[in-house]
Amino acid sequence: MDHLPIFCQLRDRDCLIVGGGDVAERKARLLLEAGARLTVNALTFIPQFTVWANEGMLTLVEGPFDETLLDSCWLAIAATDDDTVNQRVSDAAESRRIFCNVVDAPKAASFIMPSIIDRSPLMVAVSSGGTSPVLARLLREKLESLLPQHLGQVARYAGQLRARVKKQFATMGERRRFWEKFFVNDRLAQSLANADEKAVNATTERLFSEPLDHRGEVVLVGAGPGDAGLLTLKGLQQIQQADIVVYDRLVSDDIMNLVRRDADRVFVGKRAGYHCVPQEEINQILLREAQKGKRVVRLKGGDPFIFGRGGEELETLCHAGIPFSVVPGITAASGCSAYSGIPLTHRDYAQSVRLVTGHLKTGGELDWENLAAEKQTLVFYMGLNQAATIQEKLIAFGMQADMPVALVENGTSVKQRVVHGVLTQLGELAQQVESPALIIVGRVVGLRDKLNWFSNH
């Protein structure tokens, strides 16, 4: 270990920054947030330092580096654009046994600054030992996405409850189970973020009163259309906290690789015309696992409330009294059209967009007359097997035969393929495409040649 990671208590302690530019300003901001009593020594200062000085937040000393300013300091930072001056600051601090950071010169420094994820009082620091700051920044960004913004409020509130938890739960095991429930309770976190004291108190009392082996909960998460980068931050957080993930075939391998490693996984792959697991059985799986006290994530491609049968699954849970929540996802229509260079609306071509299922219940019929109207875009989900019928019906109800159409296969993924033509070719084009695929009908498809960006990357 090249460096010992420590967290310094700097509140009301004297610290010195030498330098008055942008880099020094970023360092000063961190020290001020830590409550340091800050002095800044430089030949010139950018305006922000003057603002802080006028507000009494720090002291400015204009002029060359004055090493006597170090005499009362606990910590120093050299942040000038002059290597010679920075080395003088480092040497003067070293002679006084004061820790000193030298910006962009880790070998000249006695401490380095990590990349910080601030969820005070929870703090996470990431460092590459000064060898690769970019790598440390990338790791910090990844951790930022995993830690909810309101986590600090939850941690602070947990501190207020420690004595009560210790009094109510006799064993370490019981306390651990309580805290596990506490920290994954979305309702509590959201209530704290909204400063809803009434909801916070109600949720807290419920957590203390219910048995530790109480029924779990189900979170319905939209995984987006395929590209793992389109998974929402909240969706990522949920699959990282799951005890069990129930997923279908539209969830990509890249997204499944983000699931918590020790979570159980249940595949319930479905596609139009063939159900690997019947819907009623899926409903029962969710119910059964939640009743065991597990945190269940039902992971669905796209958005769970847009042709995802999410409402049906939640009705079962609702009837059984199982708590649930929903994390929306980017629906296939939005993702596939964007990655195909096809805007769903456009002032010149489409003032509305319709999302339509091509897989109806037996005896069902679409409103073809309205679907054939001008100035709109149609997006058919699960319509591949019905492409010839869609073509026939739209033409029969008055849509122009030369209306542009596109079929997007494996949208937003590296396997994405788009075939396009006109309405009279739709049935034929569908023979060239495999599921999962989306059908887009409308004048906006004609913009694809101009706006297609994804296949050019």
From Swiss-Prot:
Superkingdom, according to UniProt? Answer: Bacteria
Q: Mind telling me what this protein is named?
A: Siroheme synthase
User: PANTHER family per the record?
Assistant: SIROHEME SYNTHASE, SIROHEME SYNTHASE-RELATED
Q: Where is the active site?
A: D248 (proton acceptor), K270 (proton donor)
Query: Under which EC number(s) is this enzyme classified?
Result: 2.1.1.107, 1.3.1.76, 4.99.1.4
Catalysed reactions, semicolon-separated: uroporphyrinogen III + 2 S-adenosyl-L-methionine = precorrin-2 + 2 S-adenosyl-L-homocysteine + H(+); precorrin-2 + NAD(+) = sirohydrochlorin + NADH + 2 H(+); siroheme + 2 H(+) = sirohydrochlorin + Fe(2+)
Q: Has the keyword Phosphoprotein been applied to this entry?
A: yes
Give residues annotated as binding NAD(+).
D22, V23, L43, T44
Q: In which pathway does it act?
A: Cofactor biosynthesis; adenosylcobalamin biosynthesis; precorrin-2 from uroporphyrinogen III: step 1/1; Cofactor biosynthesis; adenosylcobalamin biosynthesis; sirohydrochlorin from precorrin-2: step 1/1; Porphyrin-containing compound metabolism; siroheme biosynthesis; precorrin-2 from uroporphyrinogen III: step 1/1; Porphyrin-containing compound metabolism; siroheme biosynthesis; siroheme from sirohydrochlorin: step 1/1
The GO terms describing molecular function are: NAD binding; precorrin-2 dehydrogenase activity; sirohydrochlorin ferrochelatase activity; uroporphyrin-III C-methyltransferase activity
Q: Where is this region: Uroporphyrinogen-III C-methyltransferase?
A: 216-457
List the source organism: Salmonella newport (strain SL254)
The reply on keyword Cytoplasm is no
Which example biological process does GO assign this protein?
cobalamin biosynthetic process
Q: Which residues carry this modification: Phosphoserine?
A: S128
Tell me the PROSITE patterns matching this sequence.
SUMT_1, SUMT_2
Q: Any idea which positions bind S-adenosyl-L-methionine? A: P225, G301, G302, D303, I306, T331, A332, M382, G411
Q: What does this protein do?
A: Then it catalyzes the NAD-dependent ring dehydrogenation of precorrin-2 to yield sirohydrochlorin. Finally, it catalyzes the ferrochelation of sirohydrochlorin to yield siroheme.
What are the UniProt keywords, alphabetically?
Answer: Cobalamin biosynthesis, Lyase, Methyltransferase, Multifunctional enzyme, NAD, Oxidoreductase, Phosphoprotein, Porphyrin biosynthesis, S-adenosyl-L-methionine, Transferase
Q: Where is this region: Precorrin-2 dehydrogenase /sirohydrochlorin ferrochelatase?
A: 1-204
- For this chain, the annotated S-S bridges are none
Could you say which protein family the record assigns here?
In the N-terminal section; belongs to the precorrin-2 dehydrogenase / sirohydrochlorin ferrochelatase family.
